């Protein structure tokens, strides 16, 4: 009976004890063998011995402790040497966190066992008396049992690290969200808010400074409004400091850079000056001096910015420009009226005929009369329409001269701006009317019938009434191709998807076709196509009613409405079609109809880049013809159409002619250049033989001089 020196008493079982120890050694060896072995050369002899012994054991099939003991011990020594060498010369490497995300449960369990085996083998704990004589096997058994707990702890640590990595990103996003985009709706709404206190200060500060009753009778109201405006001014500085700007096409979102950029602009200086607390002088001078707050007028740029943004956003820019111009004129007249009343107060009311009448008169002592009289005088002076009392003193003459100059500028501005606005508003109508006039003259010159002339004029009236006179290509030509494509997709893509043969096409082909759709408008009674005509276009009905009629043009078979389409088979040029590319029906417009047209040439040009889509479209068209029994199978299998071959040959001949022409031109240029080079070489040879310098370097002799 095999005995093991341990302090515990065990039953006399030989094979189970050997198996358990073998299993423990396997756990250790499997764990340590997964590590890198830098000292494999030093243990090669032991490995050879182990290999010989394992071969003998495999043949004999013996599993006793006496026969396998040396082999197990040798393996254990090799594993310990490899581990100690790696531990001394190489640091522990943490597995890649990115790869750990893709590990399965088995790989994670194996890796956890590795780490625990290495840890327990490397620990130099003194053996206890109550423990087994195989501490390594005991340690390995314990680590295998505790692997799940360690895996959970590792997962928790990884989650914490990932959260720490994600938290800065979230904080950066929060910081970026505070930055305001100057092209966003939020920024425009803030401009609307800040424009109110700016407009309030520009209109009422000067009025309160000139008319004392207005300031004294509503003092609390003005204090509330003034300091509310100051709060908005302060908030506007914060908004400006957090407003992004473009740098190399990208929006700058860094708060420190935004603040530095803002402090370097003129707006920052004006904003600071507009918030200087000059109204603290109220405590010394009194509350009836609102002119102390005139520094709040430095915020005028915000009002102009609001007007500019509104002009670009509104759908009626011409009307907005006219209203904006009238507002500027009213503000100038308002300021001029207040200054006139202030000058009259400085000179003395009623001292002469030019100043404001004496306020001792109850009729002229009212606040409303004071302002209206001053406004009336200012309007007459600036518009130079009516007559006003002549000035008497030098100060009055100087003020009137300045008013006349300002009035002339205002009058010129009004005439110029209003004239240009009206011309811009009527530009489209004038251009459209010019087209009608030219067509009328042509029809009169060619003596067109009255019926046809009436139809033409009605067609033009329909276009103008329904705002369909806009040339889309002319309007969109200034846009880049990307924006053109997006507008066309937004307008026409849903319409094109209704066509049966285009429903499963790839998006790139649909975009190409959308850009090639052309609008077409037909009058009542117009034939879109007739039976037997060559089909060069397909049509999609956007709005209106079309009728499939008989040869007489009256009998209606089918009425086509919005979203219907026809002619899609004829532009595909499918082989074996019984009708060829001919129209098979008469289609007539019942009323005014708006259609989209796609030509055969445009379709084929788009399909050159999509050969697979071309095959798919032809197959769909062939299936449609087969359902309607409109395809000849023999012709379809016969091969290429002779007409197509003739067209290709003609195209090749044309290309060959153009290439020959280009080659002849290039050959002539080459011969001419070669001739010039030969002449130049001959001249140089003759000069060298005669011993003369080249022409450009020949000195002028006295004989050559005049």
Swiss-Prot record:
The chain crosses the membrane at residues 190-211, 218-238, 266-285, 290-307, 318-340, 367-397, 398-422. Residues 317-425 are annotated as: Ion conduction pathway. The C-terminal coiled-coil domain mediates homotrimerization of CNGA subunits. Signal peptide: none annotated. Pfam families: CLZ, cNMP_binding, Ion_trans. Residues 645-688 form a coiled coil. Residues 384-387 are annotated as: Selectivity filter. Residues 507-627 are annotated as: Cyclic nucleotide-binding domain. It is found in: Cell membrane. 3',5'-cyclic GMP binds at residues 567-568, 570, 583-584, 628. This is Cyclic nucleotide-gated channel alpha-3. Residues 147-177 have a biased composition (Basic and acidic residues). GO terms for cellular component: cone photoreceptor outer segment; intracellular cyclic nucleotide activated cation channel complex; plasma membrane.
């Amino acid at each position: 009976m095999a005995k093991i020196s341990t302090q515990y008493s065990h039953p006399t079982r030989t094979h189970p004890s050997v198996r358990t120890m073998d299993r423990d050694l396997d756990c250790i060896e499997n764990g340590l063998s997964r590590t890198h072995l830098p000292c494999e050369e030093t243990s090669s002899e032991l490995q050879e011995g182990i290999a010989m012994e394992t071969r003998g054991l495999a043949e004999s099939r013996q599993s006793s402790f006496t026969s396998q003991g040396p082999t197990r011990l040798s393996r254990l020594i090799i594993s310990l040497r490899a581990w100690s060498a790696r531990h001394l010369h190489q640091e522990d490497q943490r597995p890649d966190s990115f790869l750990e995300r893709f590990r399965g449960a088995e790989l994670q369990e194996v890796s956890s066992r590795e780490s625990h085996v290495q840890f327990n083998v490397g620990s130099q704990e003194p053996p206890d008396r109550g423990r087994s004589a195989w501490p390594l096997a005991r340690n390995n058994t314990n680590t295998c049992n505790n692997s799940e707990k360690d895996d959970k702890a590792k997962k928790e640590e990884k989650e914490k690290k990932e959260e720490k990595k994600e938290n800065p990103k979230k904080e950066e996003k929060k910081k970026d969200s505070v930055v305001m985009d100057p092209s966003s709706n939020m920024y425009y709404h803030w401009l609307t808010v800040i424009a109110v206190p700016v407009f309030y200060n520009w209109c009422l500060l000067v009025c309160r400074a000139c008319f004392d009753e207005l300031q004294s009778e509503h003092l609390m109201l003005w204090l509330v409004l003034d300091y509310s405006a100051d709060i908005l001014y302060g908030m506007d500085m914060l908004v400006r400091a957090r407003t992004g700007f473009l740098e190399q096409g990208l929006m700058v979102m860094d708060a420190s850079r935004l603040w530095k950029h803002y402090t370097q602009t003129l707006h920052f200086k004006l904003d600071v000056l507009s918030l200087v607390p000059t109204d603290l002088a109220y405590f010394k001078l009194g509350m009836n001096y609102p002119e102390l707050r005139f520094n709040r007028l430095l915020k005028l740029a915000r009002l102009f910015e609001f007007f500019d943004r509104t002009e670009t956003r509104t759908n009626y820019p011409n009307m907005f420009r006219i209203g904006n111009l009238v507002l500027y004129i009213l503000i100038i007249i308002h300021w001029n009226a207040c200054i006139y009343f202030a000058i009259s107060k400085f000179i003395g009311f009623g001292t002469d005929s030019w100043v404001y009448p004496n306020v001792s008169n109850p009729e002229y002592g009212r606040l409303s009369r004071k302002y209206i009289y001053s406004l009336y005088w200012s309007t007459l002076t600036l518009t130079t329409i009516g007559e006003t009392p002549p000035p008497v003193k030098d100060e009055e003459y100087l003020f009137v001269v300045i008013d006349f100059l300002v009035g002339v500028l205002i009058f010129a501005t009004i005439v110029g701006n209003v004239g240009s606005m009206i011309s811009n508003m009527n530009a489209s109508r004038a251009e459209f009317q010019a087209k009608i006039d030219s067509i009328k003259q042509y029809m009169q010159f060619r003596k067109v019938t009255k019926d046809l002339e009436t139809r033409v004029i009605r067609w033009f009236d329909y276009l103008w009434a329904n705002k369909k006179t806009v040339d889309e290509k002319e309007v969109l030509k200034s846009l880049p191709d990307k924006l053109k494509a997006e507008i066309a997709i937004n307008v026409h893509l849903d319409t094109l998807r209704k066509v049966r043969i285009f429903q499963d096409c790839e998006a790139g082909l649909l975009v190409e076709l959308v850009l090639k759709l052309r609008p077409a408008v037909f009058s009542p009674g117009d034939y879109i196509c007739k039976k037997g005509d060559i089909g060069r276009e397909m049509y999609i009905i956007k709005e209106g009613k079309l009728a499939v009629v008989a040869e007489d043009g009256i009998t209606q078979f089918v009425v086509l409405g919005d979203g219907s389409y026809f002619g899609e088979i004829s532009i595909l040029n499918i082989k074996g079609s019984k009708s060829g590319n001919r129209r098979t029906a008469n289609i007539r417009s019942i009323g005014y109809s708006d259609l989209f047209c796609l030509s055969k040439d445009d379709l084929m040009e788009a399909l050159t880049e999509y050969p697979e889509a071309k095959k798919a479209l032809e197959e769909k068209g062939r299936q449609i013809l087969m359902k309607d029994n409109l395809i000849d199978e023999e012709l379809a299998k016969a091969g290429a159409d002779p007409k197509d071959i003739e067209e290709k040959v003609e195209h090749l001949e044309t290309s060959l002619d153009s290439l020959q022409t280009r080659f002849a031109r290039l050959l002539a240029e080459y011969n001419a250049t070669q001739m010039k080079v030969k002449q130049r070489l001959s001249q140089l040879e003759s000069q060298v033989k005669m011993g003369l310098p080249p022409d450009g370097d020949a000195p002028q002799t006295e004989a050559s001089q005049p």
